[in-house]
């Protein structure tokens, strides 16, 4: 699903359920400035079991390796209009049962 409203007032770019029934959120960034200027993405973490950054091919992924972007937690997907590849799997951080 795209543009999914969350209870905290944020809106997830993409949200889905994987084959194991886990909730996955993908925050899409198409430009370096968009990626570097996003301070709201941690607000999504309480609403998913796995969180990914979705990027187009060619976008500099170096910022995602810094501690500010939690590389130990957040996965990276690179996609174009035809295909997608998980370059770094997201860590499992199970949702609280109340969510």
Model regions and ranges:
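Glycine-rich, phosphate-binding/catalytic loops in enzymes
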Residues: 41-45, 69-70
């Amino acid at each position: 699903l795209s543009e999914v409203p969350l209870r905290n007032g944020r809106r997830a770019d993409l949200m889905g359920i994987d084959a194991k029934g886990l909730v996955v959120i993908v925050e899409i960034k198409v430009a370096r400035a968009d990626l570097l200027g996003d301070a709201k993405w941690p607000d999504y973490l309480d609403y998913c079991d796995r969180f990914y950054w979705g990027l187009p091919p060619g976008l500099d992924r170096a910022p995602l390796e810094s501690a500010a972007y939690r590389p130990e937690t957040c996965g990276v997907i690179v996609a174009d209009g035809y295909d997608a590849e998980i370059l770094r799997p997201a860590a499992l951080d199970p949702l609280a049962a109340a969510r």
